Amino acid sequence: DSAQVRLLHKGEIGTDPTTGEPEYDFPIYEVHKLDVDGSGRDRTVLCKGESCELCRAGNKPSLRMFIQLVNLDEKDKEKQVQLWERGLTDIKQMIGLTSEYGDLTKRNIKIVRSGSKGSLKTTYQYFPKDPSEMEVPEAQKLVGSLILDLDKEDQIKAIEGRLQLSKGGNNADNEGSSRGGRSAANRVF
């Protein structure tokens, strides 16, 4: 299985003046997955580090990258902007791609999946194409919408499965909602 995509993230965007290390615009967060409202559906919640009630309750966070992209193989224009959530292996590969190819919004990338959808053994290969002009939409802010940013009180409610999710606002159930005709929940693979 494969997809031809255009990323909405440039990759390397500069250098940290204090460390000299490259800075990237990939949205990479330490997050928790849990059913916050008793619906039976896991949500993504931003980890608060040392003050995180979810960590204290034994819910281990994981480092995740949330890549927004245009899936050029998708025929329905309303579903072309998609979100792809990846882990550490793909974070390293994306950093390698930007180091080698520069601004990733300037070229299409063919992504090839080896393995079954949903399998932990599935791997992905990335094949950047020649640079070409294409207008891409701006990447959406995910923290506060798809990634819940909860205060201590709401973290405790989430642990107990009794957080009230509302339409709009920080605890919004935006995973299936549309922003400007684009759904944040469309998945590539």
Language-model features and meaning:
Residues R64-F66, D103, N108, T123:
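Beta-strand-rich binding-surface signature
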Residues D1-S99, D149-G168, A184-F189:
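OB-fold ssDNA-binding interfaces and closely related basic DNA-contact patches used
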Residues E100-G118:
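Elongated alpha-helical scaffolds
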Residues G115, I159-E160, N174:
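Charge-dense, intrinsically disordered terminal/linker segments
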Residues E133, E138-G144, L163-F189:
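Interfaces that engage single-stranded nucleic acids at replication/repair/recombination sites
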Residues S114-G144:
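OB-fold/S1-family single-stranded nucleic acid-binding modules
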Residues L69-N71, I111-R113, P128:
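Hydrophobic side chains in beta-strands
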